[in-house]
């Protein structure tokens, strides 16, 4: 593994990471602050009267707690889509960009071989996702317990975020693998992103 390449990649992707953190902050804060336990009770009654409609939007059980609310309105779609787009762009910057611009040859001319370079890019990929998911967890914990003063089932919330991290590593690995296999940018990004979106649908 190349520590120099690791530091360079982490620095070069800071701006993109901050943009996605800002997006998650915007959606996460706004949606968390929308929580109202009384509305939750009303939504439960509405879900009982129209179960098919709520099931179509992935809300079979709207719930009445803060965690149920977050699962339905954040974890059901937004916190899957935004980090997945991050995975697509990160796969491009870590692998596909070098292949597309022909600069992979310069990396291979260093003392590090293909295996070491690939290992470094994988470590960067996992670290970037870990930072994003850790930030998301801390943000939602802060918004719900400090700003809204609502109690969360901490361990259930933690397991939920660990599961989300694992899901994004899986979806992101499809994009990363696709970027490694194909030389042309339309295939390297298109195949991984396309398969990932099929999983989401």
Regions found by a protein language model. Give the residues of each.
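Short coil/turn motifs that cap or connect alpha-helices
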Residues: 113-114
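Interfacial/capping segments of alpha-helical transmembrane domains
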Residues: 32-54
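Transmembrane helix boundary and interhelical loop/hinge segments in multi-pass membrane proteins
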Residues: 88-108, 122
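Interfacial loop/helix-cap signal at membrane boundaries in integral membrane proteins
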Residues: 48-74
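Secretory targeting signals
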Residues: 29-32, 119-171, 175-180
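Long, hydrophobic alpha-helical segments
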Residues: 71-96
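Transmembrane helix segments
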Residues: 29-37, 185-201
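Aromatic- and glycine-rich beta-strand/loop motifs that create alpha-glucan
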Residues: 1-24
């Amino acid at each position: 593994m190349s520590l120099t390449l690791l530091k360079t990649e982490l620095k070069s992707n800071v701006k993109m990471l901050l943009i996605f953190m800002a997006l998650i902050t915007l959606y996460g804060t706004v949606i968390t602050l929308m929580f109202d336990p009384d509305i939750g009770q009303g939504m439960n009654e509405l879900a009982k009267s129209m179960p098919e409609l709520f099931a179509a939007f992935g809300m079979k059980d709207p719930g009445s707690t803060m965690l149920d609310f977050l699962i339905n309105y954040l974890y059901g779609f937004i916190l899957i889509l935004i980090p997945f787009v991050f995975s697509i762009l990160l796969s491009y910057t870590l692998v596909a960009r070098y292949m597309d611009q022909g600069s992979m040859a310069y990396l291979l001319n260093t003392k590090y071989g293909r295996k070491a370079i690939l290992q470094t890019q994988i470590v960067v990929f996992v670290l970037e996702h870990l930072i994003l998911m850790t930030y998301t967890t801390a943000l939602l914990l802060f918004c719900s317990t400090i700003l809204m003063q609502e109690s969360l089932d901490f361990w259930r919330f933690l397991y939920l975020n660990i599961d989300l991290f694992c899901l994004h590593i899986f979806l992101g690995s499809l994009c990363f693998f696709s970027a490694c296999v194909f030389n042309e940018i339309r295939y390297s990004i298109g195949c991984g992103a396309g398969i990932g979106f099929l999983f989401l649908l």
